[in-house]
Amino acid sequence: MKKIAIAAITATSILALSACSSGDKEVIAKTDAGDVTKGELYTNMKKTAGASVLTQLVQEKVLDKKYKVSDKEIDNKLKEYKTQLGDQYTALEKQYGKDYLKEQVKYELLTQKAAKDNIKVTDADIKEYWEGLKGKIRASHILVADKKTAEEVEKKLKKGEKFEDLAKEYSTDSSASKGGDLGWFAKEGQMDETFSKAAFKLKTGEVSDPVKTQYGYHIIKKTEERGKYDDMKKELKSEVLEQKLNDNAAVQEAVQKVMKKADIEVKDKDLKDTFNTSSTSNSTSSSSSNSK
């Protein structure tokens, strides 16, 4: 959810930099103390945001040459963000335009593909993750506001409609875009107590009756419990990779592996060291963002 909002902040810097040039003396603000020119704005914008903007523009060109992102992938990601962000997404689209958000999502997807190509998942990583699943289950849910809607969903499930499809159609939870999947969780401390008790009573594959909590009415499906390591290894490898893809520092490190193979030469003397320091600065800023 944060990524598209961060992209919008980057948008402000890129649009401002592209709107003026260092040699432009056109006055854009007048005061009793003196005027401010486009050139002064450009110089100051370059000092504060030039390196990060240049990094994104160059990375996108390099990654776009090596990896391909389809229009369908972009549209699906935008739909996911729209579901997650709601009114915030509408505000971003109104402020920056759909085309710009598409471009930012394309950059994000290119980055993910580079990360998948360069991030390694070891057997030790998988074993550690498997050990951490002890006592946990995996479940999905459909959250609705009232009992009547819950009963309507329940009827459709009994008629054979897919749980995942109904979650996407009816659920008001952010997990809707993932078919209601909540991932793995323990019996205590992670979920609403009433919800957790109902989920842990289910057999794998079983669907609950509507369960009322402070959030509304849930229909819960237990999808998995921890099995033997060898039986789960392939599936868990994908889950561990997904976790690593959500680690911005790991993603930036993976992207830098691609960038190091590109023949990058920065002509601007003020920005010539951008790609000597961008790896460190990006990782640091990403880690800071995650900790907030």
Curated annotation (Swiss-Prot):
Enzymatic reactions: [protein]-peptidylproline (omega=180) = [protein]-peptidylproline (omega=0)
Effect of G216A: Decreased secretion of proteins; no effect on growth
Membrane topology per record: Lipid-anchor
Subcellular location: Cell membrane; Membrane raft
Gene Ontology CC terms: membrane raft; plasma membrane
The keyword Coiled coil belongs to this UniProt entry's keyword annotation: no
Any one Pfam family match given in the protein's UniProt record, by short name: Rotamase_3
InterPro entries the UniProt entry points to: Foldase_PrsA, PPIase_dom_sf, PPIase_PpiC, PPIase_PpiC_CS, PrsA_foldase, Trigger_fac_C_sf, Trigger_fact/SurA_dom_sf
Entry keyword set: Cell membrane, Isomerase, Lipoprotein, Membrane, Palmitate, Rotamase, Signal
GO molecular function per UniProt: peptidyl-prolyl cis-trans isomerase activity
N-palmitoyl cysteine-type lipidated residues: C20
Span of the signal peptide: 1-19
Enzyme nomenclature, EC number: 5.2.1.8
Disulfide linkage: none
Domain PpiC: from-to ranges: 134-224
Biased composition (Low complexity): 276-292
Lipid group attachment sites (S-diacylglycerol cysteine): C20
Function: Essential protein that plays a major role in protein secretion by helping the post-translocational extracellular folding of several secreted proteins. Has PPIase activity but it is not essential for its function in vivo.
PANTHER family: FOLDASE PROTEIN PRSA (PTHR47245:SF1), PEPTIDYLPROLYL ISOMERASE (PTHR47245)
Family listed: Belongs to the PrsA family.
Protein name in UniProt: Foldase protein PrsA
Biological source species: Bacillus subtilis (strain 168)
Gene: prsA
